[in-house]
Amino acid sequence: MPALAPPVGDERHALHTFLAYQQDAFVAVAHGLTDEQARATPTVSALSIGGLIKHVTGMQRIWMQRVAAAPDKPPTDTRDIEERTREYRDEYVMGPHQTLAGLLDAYAAQNAETLRLAQTADLDAAVPVPRDSPWFPKDVEA
């Protein structure tokens, strides 16, 4: 992985290259780790490398649903709150029966979908920001 992203010719190519560069960083961080090492939390943080990979996979999926629906909102998740809460909590933890290879396969599939949308999405369409999350500024319109 190079230290700097390569030069680009236009906005869409820049977006694609930037996203691919960021995606590659997580693969590099996990390179050579065993499942046990990917699951480990050796610092005060409860996050592991495997948990981070699951989280970035999920965040790409959620944001790409928004990008695909823009300028409209994505379809509402109609599952019950307990199921959505379990999924949210599970997103940060590499479970005992999960493998790093499996997580990286899911990540690679989502990366491909993200890069596909970067090539096809309307870059002028405003992507709605969730209003139900406290970490998003209330004064952001898109």
Residue ranges and their predicted role:
Residues 1-13, 58-117, 124-135:
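Short, helix-capping/interhelical loops that line the mouth of catalytic, cofactor-
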Residues 31-38, 119, 123-126:
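Short, flexible helix-adjacent loops and helix caps
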Residues 9-35, 54-55, 59-69:
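Alpha-helical bundle segments that constitute or directly flank the non-heme di-iron/ferroxidase center
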Residues 135-142:
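Individual transmembrane alpha-helices with interfacial aromatic-anchor signatures
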Residues 42-47, 140:
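Short, aromatic/basic-enriched loop-to-helix "N-cap" motif that marks the start
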